[in-house]
């Protein structure tokens, strides 16, 4: 083998090694320590005695943890309901969101009092175009109005239970994975719910920095 061939072979080997390292670093994900996720920090809460008997239920286990934690920290059922609703907007985007509407039925158990209904579900447009159909007054205002009348905890504090789920991330469950597979073609490929060319899967961690910023603005400036 002459010197030219040796040099050529050496260059090819170096290029191959460099490409291999680049491929490794580009395809190897930075692993997230799931024990540090906010949802796991609040999972093992202990009842403080602020409320002797209570129950929180929702479509999402993480949102339910948020509601439990709010009550454990001294909030009432309305506070927990608002926290759960906002947590669902983070963890259940296929069914919940800040642009939606809704209705809430509240009852505090006082003698002679009838349940109260808060409705915030009128739509801004009946001619649907992607992104232009939102609730008026909508979810955010509806939650705020309900909390003003029925809540106990400082509303800004409630947001602090939810924002870390968007900012630091949450673990995808099987239901979200299934929904994303069905509706993935309608989602922007640059969204946090895509990893490369495929939607995220159960066990992946999703961070939503823009949503976290929006929640902070609502917390600090109001609806």
Which positions does each model-derived feature cover?
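N-terminal Sec-pathway targeting helices
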Residues: 1-15, 22
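Activation on terminal intrinsically disordered regulatory regions flanking enzyme cores
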Residues: 15-18, 32-34
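Noncatalytic scaffold domains of N-terminal-nucleophile
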Residues: 24-65, 77-223
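Surface-exposed charged/polar residues within alpha-helices that form helix-capping/stabilizing sites
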Residues: 68-69
């Amino acid at each position: 083998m002459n010197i030219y061939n040796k040099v050529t072979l050496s260059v090819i080997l170096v290029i191959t090694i460099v490409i291999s390292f680049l491929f490794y670093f580009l395809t190897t994900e930075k692993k997230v320590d799931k024990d540090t996720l906010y949802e796991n920090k609040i999972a093992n809460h202990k009842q403080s005695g602020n409320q002797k008997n209570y129950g929180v239920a929702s479509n999402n286990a993480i949102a339910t943890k948020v509601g439990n934690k709010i009550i454990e920290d001294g909030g009432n059922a309305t506070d927990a309901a608002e926290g759960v609703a906002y947590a669902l907007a983070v963890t259940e985007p296929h069914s919940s969101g800040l642009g939606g509407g809704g209705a809430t039925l509240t009852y505090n158990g006082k003698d002679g009092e009838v349940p109260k209904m808060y409705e915030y579900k009128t739509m801004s447009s009946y001619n649907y175009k992607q992104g232009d159909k939102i609730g008026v007054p909508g979810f955010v205002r509806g939650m705020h109005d309900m909390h003003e009348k029925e809540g106990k905890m400082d509303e800004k504090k409630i947001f602090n239970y939810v924002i870390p789920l968007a900012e630091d991330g949450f673990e995808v469950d099987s239901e979200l994975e299934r929904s994303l597979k069905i509706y993935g073609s309608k989602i922007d490929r640059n969204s946090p719910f895509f990893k490369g060319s495929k939607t995220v899967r159960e066990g992946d961690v999703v961070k939503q920095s823009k949503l976290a910023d929006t929640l902070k603005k609502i917390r600090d400036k109001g609806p």
